[in-house]
Swiss-Prot record:
NCBIfam families per record: autotrans_barl, O_hepto_targRPT
Protein name per the record: Putative uncharacterized outer membrane protein YejO
InterPro entries: AIDA, Autotransporte_beta, Autotransporte_beta_dom_sf, Autotransporter_adhesion, Autotransporter_pectin_lyase_C, OM_autotransptr_brl_dom, Pectin_lyase_fold/virulence, Pertactin_central
UniProt keyword annotation of Transmembrane present: yes
Gene that this sequence comes from: yejO
Gene Ontology CC terms: cell outer membrane
Autotransporter domain boundaries: 595-863
A Pfam family matched in the record: AIDA
PROSITE patterns: AUTOTRANSPORTER
Taxon lineage: Bacteria, Pseudomonadati, Pseudomonadota, Gammaproteobacteria, Enterobacterales
Residues of the signal peptide: 1-29
Length: 863
């Protein structure tokens, strides 16, 4: 071997090793020297440099084979790796199942079969069969004797050539008129491309032809999956576009023509006539050109910067007026004009220019007028705009509709405000508006408003000369800042219309009203369409008031607070009930140890309680509480008395259903201590102190069904003292008693998601109770004891000033003061000398609170 060859070999090997080391965790290189032959090598995550001959090689993913100068590979199977054929190298009878075969300049690939993968040619490819995958011929590369079967693709780029191509049915060719030369046969006969002229091309199944400026294409067939793209200045005649084929062209093409369902279409001298587009085909109408009687169907597109007349947009096709997107660049034109368009389940976007007389129909029909573009006049609608049969009409910002007669029939017009930082409202003017079972929706631009404060909200004023028919208007208000959407009819208004207003939690000043509708006359009737004819605005509900002077205003109804207000009151009123339910477990424990001798005990009690509550402030809810209390206590005996001292820890969860919709939750964590003293004559005194941590969550419902969410934490503390006398007569005992209970929460401020502000003051219990308990003790033969018992009590609640402030509308008082009765029954049982249990149930009613049940079940272990 010559020294120069050795140096070249070393340099090549080192280059490959360095490159692969950078991109592969494991890269092993082997060399087949000049004159050497190897057979059956499998390459996986390694590299082979071939200067000699490599037969029957398999290249799997991660493997590479480099056929160097005068190197040869025979019968190589490529399954995902790379084969590089360098200058004067050759690959014979290769099969590509996946991966790449790259033929560099001066290299050759002969008798190659592509099942999948890519054969990329900068040199030469001879006798290639493409069953799948792609053969790409780059500039100065060439392919001779190519058979393209169904699913295969031959791509010839500018400056490349392909001779003797056999394009079988379903085979695809992708190329340009700037290819050096391409010729062969297809199922329609012979085809060729040379010197910028393409003849008899068949485009299908992913094939395409790009006709460049000043180039020509004659008698092109665009079948399903094919694409013919005609650049500005290109000429195409005899186009036969089949179903599923695509044709993309602009009116700046010198000429495009061919047959269609109307006979013949043409684009010539800047005028398109009778052009039918479907299956993703596209037409661009350039400035100072025009399109006449164009039909867009089946996802076709049309972009017009010029003038079009009689265009039909249907079957999910898309039309753009005053805007085009080409080669990554967007162009606008205020000179664009569209006249007499019909949209039938298609979409038209108006970016700039003027649209004169348009009809939109069908559930998928959309006419959307975009907000004014920078440095361009607002888009204009002129003449009749008829929207019907479930179609949608949308306008963004201050577009020019002052000369439009809008007719809405069973359809929706969405007016979208242009959000700005200058707080300029959107003003929209019409010539006339007619409605029939239609909706007009005024709304914000659907973008994140994090940088726009509530005071900068952009409202809409819709002004029309006349209004007739029937339908609904959906408006936004900001009563607190005296702003809203408005409808202004300068002339006559006739018909029946409903106004829908969005609920909000923020309150205006007391007595404020806000005018939403004004007319110049006529017998039109406007009513509030919200559920119940009311809208939630802060603390109180509002109604739509006919002022008697052809104007209608939102006015406050102080007789009824909003559901959000009741939600705030409900949560405040529920917390004392949580404290009380947890307290009952400790009272049961203290009652069960009267006259019982033990040293130390651990106990637990599970509770389930239901409370139905109404307050004078208007709150109303149903509370279901479940919880568990754990305790430990010890008994200390003296000469004539005994004492008990203990600690408790508990948790409870309350599900609260609000009477006017929505729900809340309270998770309570409690810690406390208790003590009792009992004299041998039966006199006793019990005491409990307890603190709570409340985690409160609100999922309220406004009148319109929207959610008002909020959460906050609060704390509570309370004490209970009970004194009585226990008489024992044989197995019977009677225990009359008096008790006093006090409880308070700390004040908390929070805000709901609808903007309502709540300032909850101290919520308190101050209660006196008088009652009597009766029990009977039974000893069973198996050693078990039973003690059924009954208790009845009368409670008097004195706390009548539990105040809650909502927004700035004064304070509401959750007053549950009054008299109530409580009736209880239970049973205690000892199973063993150290294990006992109890069950109880109670009913209470009075002072705005009904407790259908309060159940307890517990066990006690003494030791």
């Amino acid at each position: 071997m010559h020294q120069s060859g050795s140096v070249s070999l070393c340099r090549s090997a080192i280059s490959v090793l360095v490159a692969t080391a950078l991109y592969s965790p494991i890269a092993l290189a082997s060399t087949v020297e000049y004159g050497e032959t190897v057979d059956g090598v499998v390459l996986e995550k390694d590299i082979q440099l071939v200067y000699g001959t490599a037969n029957n090689t398999k290249i799997n993913p991660g493997g590479e084979q480099h056929i160097k100068e005068f190197g040869v590979s025979n019968n190589t199977e490529i399954n995902g790796g790379y084969q590089y054929i360098e200058m004067n190298g050759a690959a014979e009878y290769s099969v590509l199942n996946d991966g790449y075969q790259i033929v560099q300049m001066g290299g050759a690939a002969n008798q190659t079969t592509l099942n999948n993968g890519v054969l990329q040619v900068y040199g030469a490819a001879n006798d290639t069969t493409i069953k799948g995958g792609r053969l790409i011929v780059e500039k100065d590369g060439g392919a001779v004797f190519v058979a393209i079967e169904k699913g295969g693709l031959l791509e010839v780029k500018e400056g490349g050539f392909a001779f003797a191509v056999d394009q079988k049915a379903g085979g695809a060719i992708k190329t340009t008129t700037r290819a050096m030369e391409v010729f062969g046969t297809n199922r329609l006969g012979q085809f060729d491309i040379k010197n910028g002229i393409a003849n008899n091309m068949l485009l299908e199944n992913g094939g395409s032809l790009r006709v460049e400026e000043n180039d020509f294409a004659y008698n092109t067939t665009v079948d399903s999956g094919g694409l013919l793209e005609v650049m500005d200045g290109g000429t195409v005649t005899g186009v036969d576009k089949k179903a599923g084929g695509k044709l993309i062209v602009s009116t700046n093409a010198l000429e495009v023509s061919g047959p269609n369902s109307k006979g013949q279409f043409s684009i010539k001298d800047g005028v398109s006539k009778n052009y039918e587009l479907d299956d993703g085909s596209g037409l661009i109408v350039m400035e100072d050109t025009q399109a006449i009687d164009t039909i867009l169907d089946k996802h076709a597109t049309m972009q017009s910067l010029g003038k079009d007349t009689g265009t039909k947009v249907q079957a999910n096709a898309v039309y753009d007026l005053g805007r085009s997107y080409q080669n990554g660049s967007i162009t606008y034109s205020s000179k664009a004009i569209s006249e007499n368009m019909v949209i039938n389940n298609g979409r038209a976007n108006v970016w700039a220019g003027t649209m004169v007389n348009v009809s939109v129909r069908g559930n998928d029909g959309i006419l959307e007028v975009m907000k004014p573009q920078i440095n361009y006049a607002p888009a204009m609608l002129v003449g009749k705009v008829v929207v019907s049969e479930g179609a949608s009409f949308r306008t963004h910002g201050a577009v020019d509709t002052s000369k439009a007669d809008v007719s809405l029939e069973n359809s929706v017009w969405t007016i979208i405000a242009d959000i700005t930082t200058t707080n300029q409202n959107t003003l929209l003017n019409l010539a006339n508006l007619a409605m029939s079972d239609a909706n007009v929706i005024m709304m914000d631009e659907p973008v994140t408003r994090s940088s726009v404060t509530a005071s900068a909200e952009n409202f809409i004023t819709l002004t029309t000369n006349t209004l007739s028919g029937n339908g609904n208007f959906y408006m936004r208000t900001d009563m607190a800042n005296h702003q809203s959407d408005q409808l202004n009819v300068t002339g006559q208004a006739t018909g029946d219309f409903k106004i829908f207003v969005t609920d909000t939690g923020a309150s205006p000043a007391a007595g404020d009203s806000l005018t939403l509708v004004t007319t110049g006359g006529g017998d039109a009737a406007f009513t509030l369409g919200n559920a119940g004819g009311v809208v939630d605005i802060g603390t109180y509900e509002y109604t739509l008031l006919d002022n008697g002077n052809h104007s209608w205003s939102l006015a406050e109804n102080r007789a009824q607070i909003t559901p959000s207000t009741t939600d705030v009151l409900n949560m405040a009123a529920a917390q004392p009930l949580v404290f009380d339910a947890e307290l009952d477990t400790v009272r049961e424990r203290l009652g069960s140890v009267k006259g019982v001798s033990y040293d130390t005990a651990m106990w637990s009690s599970a509770i389930n309680t239901r409370n139905n509550v109404t307050t004078d402030a208007g709150a109303g809810f149903e509370q279901t509480l479940t919880g568990l209390t754990l305790g430990i206590d010890s008994r200390f005996s003296r000469e004539e008395s005994s004492t008990i001292r203990g600690l408790i820890f508990g948790y409870s969860h309350s599900d609260i259903g609000f009477d006017r919709g929505g729900k809340g939750n309270i998770d309570s964590y409690t810690l406390g201590a208790y003590a009792g003293w009992e004299h041998q004559n039966g006199a006793y005194v019990d005491g409990v102190v307890k603190v709570d941590r409340f985690a409160n969550t609100i999922h309220g419902k406004m009148s319109n069904g929207a959610t008002a969410f909020g959460d906050y934490n609060s704390n509570g503390a309370g004490a209970h003292v009970e004194s009585g006398f226990r008489w024992v007569d044989g197995l019977w005992s009677v225990r009359p008693y008096l008790a006093f209970t006090g409880f308070t929460t700390d004040g908390q401020d929070y805000t709901l998601s609808n903007g309502m502000r709540a300032d909850v003051g101290n919520t308190r219990i101050l209660r006196a109770e008088a009652g009597t308990a009766v029990s009977y003790h039974m000893d069973l033969q198996n050693g078990t004891t039973l003690e059924p018992w009954l208790k009845a009590a009368v409670r008097q609640e004195y706390a009548d000033s539990n105040q809650v402030k909502v927004n700035d509308d004064g304070k509401f008082n959750n007053d549950v003061a009054g008299t109530s009765g409580v009736y209880q029954a239970g049973i205690r049982s000892s199973f063993t000398p150290t294990l006992s249990g109890h069950l109880s149930v109670s009913y209470g009613n009075g002072a705005g609170v009904e407790s259908p049940w309060n159940t307890q079940a517990g066990v006690v272990w003494t030791f």
